[in-house]
Amino acid sequence: YMKVALVHDYIKEFGGAERVLRVLSDLYPSAPIYTAFRVKGSTCDKEFSDRKIVESKWAIILKYFNLYSPLRFLAPLVWSSIDLSEYDLVITSCSSFFARGFKTGKNTKVVAYCHTPPRFLYGYETSINLQRFWVVRVYAVVVNHFLRLFDYWSASKINNWIVNSENVKKRVWKFYRKDSVVIYPPVEVEKLSKASKEVKKENYFLIVSR
C-alpha cells in the first residue's frame, strides 16, 4: 500500500491548473490535498468538496484581506510548515505560489507537474501586472532575489518533473537546469464534434481563456 499526497498552490479559482489537479485527484481519490490556503465557498473549493483538503498554518494570514500576493515572501515559511514525511509519493501541482519546499521523508518520491515557474520572478508578464507601480518594483527587487533562491533550492528537491508544454519545458531547464517530460493537460475529446462545414482561415488568432 503506497501512501500518496497531492499538493497545490492554493484552492481559490478553478482554472486550468485546478482542472489538472482534479484529474490527479481522480487518479488518487484517497490522497489528501495539501495547500497554502483554501477559500471556502470559492469555485475551486466547491469542485473539491468531496476531497480532504489540508491548509498550511499560515492560511489565515494569507487569506486575510486577500493578501497572499504581496505576502509571497512568506512562501518558504508556508511550505516548510507542511510535513509530508509519512508519504511514499507526493505529486505537486506547482505554479505561481511555488508548492514546493515542504518536508519529506528519506524515501519519499516527489513528482512535480509544473504549469510554469513563477512568472513574476523571471520577468514574464502576469495577469495582474502589479510591477507597473514603482513601489511594487522596489519591493520586488528586494524580495524576489530571496524568492528566486528558494525557488531554485526547492526545485532541486524534486525527483521527477512533468510540464504542460514545450515552452514550460524550456523554462524549467533555463531556470532550474532540470530535464522534464511534457504531458499535455487532459482534454475530453469525445465531447468535441467536427465542424459541420469547412472553416475559412483568416488572418487572426483566437485565444480562449478564463
Ranges and model annotations:
Residues 7-9, 164, 207-209:
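Short hydrophobic "strand-cap" motifs at the C-terminus of beta-strands
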Residues 167, 186:
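Carbohydrate-associated surface elements
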Residues 89-92, 103-133, 162, 181:
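Active-site proximal beta-strand in glycosyltransferases
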Residues 199-210:
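Conserved donor-binding/catalytic core segment of Leloir-type glycosyltransferases
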Residues 130-161, 169:
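Membrane-proximal helix-turn-helix segments that form the acceptor-binding/catalytic region
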Residues 2-14, 36-37:
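Nucleotide-activated donor-dependent transferases that construct or modify glycoconjugates
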Residues 30-99:
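Active-site donor-binding segments of glycosyltransferases and PAPS-dependent sulfotransferases
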Residues 17-27:
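Short amphipathic alpha-helix
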